[in-house]
């Protein structure tokens, strides 16, 4: 009887000691060519557009746990007070997975008031890769 209790305890310990390992998906979709979406007079994040208050989006928990990666290309305007407005997700891969955290983050961004009154059609690429969030060009 003790042998079976010991054997059962051993199987329980082995089962508990082997949680499913996190394995990120290595297939990251190629970044879009941001300038290809823009007109010659549009601003591009990291070039003519630089925030004075900036927070990166939070990597969604379910995307992180499932190893999902991707990017979001955002078009936005900056008003005369340096606040973001008219935020549009132009494209995202995988579609819709990262859109909500991107919108939440961009709504918090602040810029120095533009000298021309406002900046229109600014584009920003946000990458979600291997649990990290970064800006692209």
Question: Where do the protein language model's features map onto the residues?
Answer:
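A short acidic/small-residue loop/turn micro-motif
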Residues: 61, 91-97
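Sec-dependent signal peptide recognition
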Residues: 1-9
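Bacterial Sec signal peptide processing site at the extreme N-terminus
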Residues: 16-33
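Short proline/glycine- and basic residue-enriched helix-capping loop/turn segments at helix->loop/beta transitions
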Residues: 32-75, 100-137
């Amino acid at each position: 009887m003790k042998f079976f209790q010991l054997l059962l305890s051993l199987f329980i310990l082995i089962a508990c000691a082997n949680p499913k390992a996190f394995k990120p998906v290595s297939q990251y979709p190629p970044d879009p060519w941001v300038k290809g979406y823009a007109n010659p007079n549009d601003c591009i994040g990291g070039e003519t557009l630089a925030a004075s208050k900036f927070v990166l989006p939070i990597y969604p928990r379910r995307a992180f746990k499932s190893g999902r990666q991707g990017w979001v290309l955002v078009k936005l305007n900056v008003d005369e007070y340096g606040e973001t407005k008219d935020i549009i997700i132009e494209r995202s891969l995988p579609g819709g997975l990262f859109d909500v955290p991107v919108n939440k983050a961009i709504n918090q961004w602040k810029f120095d008031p533009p000298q021309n009154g406002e900046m229109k059609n600014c584009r920003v690429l946000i990458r979600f890769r291997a649990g990290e969030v970064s800006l692209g060009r």
